[in-house]
Regions:
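Long, charge-rich, low-complexity alpha-helical segments
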Residues: 21, 34-94
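Long, low-complexity, charged/polar intrinsically disordered regions in eukaryotic proteins
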Residues: 1-29
Length: 94
């Protein structure tokens, strides 16, 4: 898998199971059988990926909603998306 860019389209992998456990959203990859816990901001990102979304639009909407620095948000989002993609929890379309 190559680097995820701002122009890439990302969305949830439809086969991933999600459940709230102890106030944390936990994802399970059926294909790889691992669990992945998400904090509140990562859970918000997961909710937004219910529909396909361009990475840069995701970063911009988070910067607006959280009143944060777009550069910091972009870095953090790219890191999270890379982790999710490497575990087959999201799909990435170049």
């Amino acid at each position: 898998m190559g680097d995820i860019t701002g122009e890439a389209i990302v969305l949830r992998n439809a086969s991933v199971l999600a459940a709230e456990i102890g106030g944390e959203l936990v994802l399970m990859s059926v294909s790889q059988w691992h669990y992945f816990g998400l904090n509140s901001v990562a859970s918000d990102i997961w909710e937004r990926l219910a529909s396909p979304m361009r990475v840069e639009a995701l970063c911009e909407s988070l910067a607006t909603d959280y009143d944060g620095d777009i550069q910091v948000i972009r870095k953090d989002v790219m890191e999270l998306l890379s982790k999710l993609a490497s575990r087959e929890l999201i799909e990435v379309e170049a």
